[in-house]
């Protein structure tokens, strides 16, 4: 059980849900420059497994690291933190 707590958990925004049972999540983080101290924002996209196809574009979701599910999928959807507002 303690092994599960060591898996990486990220929170990000869904940017694509066009694939079946797969979402693309954009995770934005900040790093501080070692010399100047300025915070630099950078982002990375992860593909995550969404078994029920419940996440939509714009949702804020939490994803967790898991075993390789395909050539590019290494994460699975844990929960939808905030649903997107549809105008």
From Swiss-Prot:
The keyword Phosphoprotein does not apply. It comes from the Bacteria. Keywords: Ribonucleoprotein, Ribosomal protein, RNA-binding, rRNA-binding. InterPro entries: NA-bd_OB-fold (IPR012340), Ribosomal_uS17 (IPR000266), Ribosomal_uS17_bact/chlr (IPR019984), Ribosomal_uS17_CS (IPR019979). SUPFAM superfamilies: Nucleic acid-binding proteins. The keyword RNA-binding applies. One of the primary rRNA binding proteins, it binds specifically to the 5'-end of 16S ribosomal RNA. PANTHER family: 40S RIBOSOMAL PROTEIN S11 FAMILY MEMBER, SMALL RIBOSOMAL SUBUNIT PROTEIN US17M. HAMAP family: Ribosomal_uS17_B. Belongs to the universal ribosomal protein uS17 family. This is Small ribosomal subunit protein uS17. It comes from Bacillus cytotoxicus (strain DSM 22905 / CIP 110041 / 391-98 / NVH 391-98).
